[in-house]
Amino acid sequence: AIMRLKLVEKDISRIEACMGRYSIRKFPKAFVMANCSDLQEGLRTWFKLSSTIPGLDMAYFYNVLTYTGQDLEEKGTQLLLYEGLEKGLGQEFDRSLYSMTEEPECIYTIIESEYTHPDFDMIHKMVQWAHKHGLEPMECVYANDMTSFFAKDRTTYCLEIYMPFKRIASPV
């Protein structure tokens, strides 16, 4: 329970520091617990895994999307457990069963949304920021619903977004 609270504290600090700002950050190193077709399948898989591996409440759901310049399409959901958290899971967790994420450099931001997924305009703004900074975003977008709260008669989600890129020019 203490590890989970520390994760929440870290998430809240990151939200306060990064909300509405763009930066470059590596995608987190994590165990890929499952690749699912959507968030609903991800939740079912998480419940199934949780019955055999205690402590999986520390896993994160990353929605995977594709940005084409004209559209933003959902591709699935990854259930990720950040590296280092496996120490709190006990012997039931066999790390050899899971692949690790790659850690590409990404355009990074946290945004508020009415939905659990970013919309096209949110990602398009990230792409515009990237181009201004000599970066060429790839099509893949990862969105993590960090937390939500109720305000102004609606639920608001804090989405952590990673978008891998390649450099097309030297940074100024």
Positions of predicted regions on the chain:
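A solvent-exposed interaction/effector surface
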Residues: 1-172
